[in-house]
């Protein structure tokens, strides 16, 4: 019985170590920047109405700022947004529709 308890404890420990390794390796990987957003810095400032606005990222990029929402006059980094492929279909009227 003691051997069975030891085996269960060993399996639980190995499982916990494996899960911990999976989560820690995922957190250490950074987001890859590429294309038009690479090496681009964006800014959050106040406009003439006192509203916080972001600027500086090209079209198709997202400005990510690692500061609280209440902070203004801070810099961020531009990241490429994921694109999606959309398909459109068009139909031509048949001879039956025209009559």
Curated annotation (Swiss-Prot):
Where in or outside the cell? Secreted
Tell me the disulfide pairings in this chain. Answer: 37-61, 42-63, 57-78
One example of the protein's molecular function in GO is: toxin activity
Give UniProt keywords alphabetically.
Answer: Complement system impairing toxin, Disulfide bond, Secreted, Signal, Toxin
**Is ATP-binding among this UniProt entry's keywords?**
no
Predominant location category: secreted
Keyword hit for Disulfide bond: yes
The signal sequence is: 1-24
One annotated Gene Ontology cellular component of this protein: extracellular region
Tissue specificity, per the record, is: Expressed in salivary glands.
- Described function: Complement inhibitor. Prevents complement-mediated C5 activation by binding to C5. Binds C5 at a different binding site than the other tick complement inhibitors OmCI and CirpT1, and the drug eculizumab.
Q: Give the UniProt family note.
A: Belongs to the RaCI family.
Give the protein name, as stated in the record.
Complement inhibitor RaCI7
The organism named in the record is Dermacentor andersoni (Rocky mountain wood tick)
Q: What is the lineage of its organism?
A: Eukaryota, Metazoa, Ecdysozoa, Arthropoda, Chelicerata
């Amino acid at each position: 019985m003691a051997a069975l308890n030891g085996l269960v404890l060993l399996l639980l420990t190995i499982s916990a170590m494996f899960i911990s390794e999976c989560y820690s390796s995922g957190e250490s990987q950074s987001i890859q920047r590429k294309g038009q957003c690479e090496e681009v810095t964006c800014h959050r400032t106040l406009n003439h109405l006192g509203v916080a606005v972001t600027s500086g990222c090209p079209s198709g990029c997202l400005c990510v700022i690692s500061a609280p929402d209440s902070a203004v006059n801070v810099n961020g980094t531009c990241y490429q947004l994921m694109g999606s492929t959309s398909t459109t279909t068009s139909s031509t009227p048949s001879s039956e529709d025209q009559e």
